[in-house]
Amino acid sequence: MRIEARIFELLTVFFIIVGVVYGFFTAQSRTGVEWAGTTAIVLTAGLSLIIGTYFRFVARRLDLRPEDYEDAEIVDGAGDLGFFSPGSFWPILLAGAGSVAALGLAFFEPWLIAVGVICVIAAAAGLVFEYHLGPEKH
């Protein structure tokens, strides 16, 4: 987690520098500082700082991972990484439901937003509980 914390802390510094440069150069224009972009960049710096700080605190509590060693090999991280369901159709349904909800937001159609959100909730529940059904359901 130390590497991830360092990445996000460097991103914070980058976004602060970009925010200052962006604010300076937009202030030189005839319309003055463009506040929407400047605010967005500064808030992005704040969000990356939050994530970097979280990763830094988590890294203190966890043991070193193979990725944290300077002389680590690929083989050091080998092993079981978890369960993957290769035949699941729920991610496709979740993506389709998210697309419907996004279209509803884009065109501001409340009925389409409602249908999309309901479908997202149903597809997310199906994805989470896919293997939590009883044995008679399979």
From Swiss-Prot:
EC number(s) given by UniProt: 7.1.1.9
Domain of life: Bacteria
Alphabetical keyword list: Cell membrane, Membrane, Translocase, Transmembrane, Transmembrane helix
Enzyme superclass (EC): translocase
InterPro entries for the chain: Cyt_c_oxidase_su4_actinobac (IPR021050)
Topological type in the membrane: Multi-pass membrane protein
Catalyses which reaction(s): 4 Fe(II)-[cytochrome c] + O2 + 8 H(+)(in) = 4 Fe(III)-[cytochrome c] + 2 H2O + 4 H(+)(out)
Membrane-crossing residue ranges in chain numbering: 7-27, 35-55, 81-101, 102-122
Predominant location: membrane
Compartment annotation: Cell membrane
Function, in words: Part of cytochrome c oxidase, its function is unknown.
SUBUNIT field: Associates with subunits I, II and III to form cytochrome c oxidase.
Listed name of the protein: Probable cytochrome c oxidase polypeptide 4
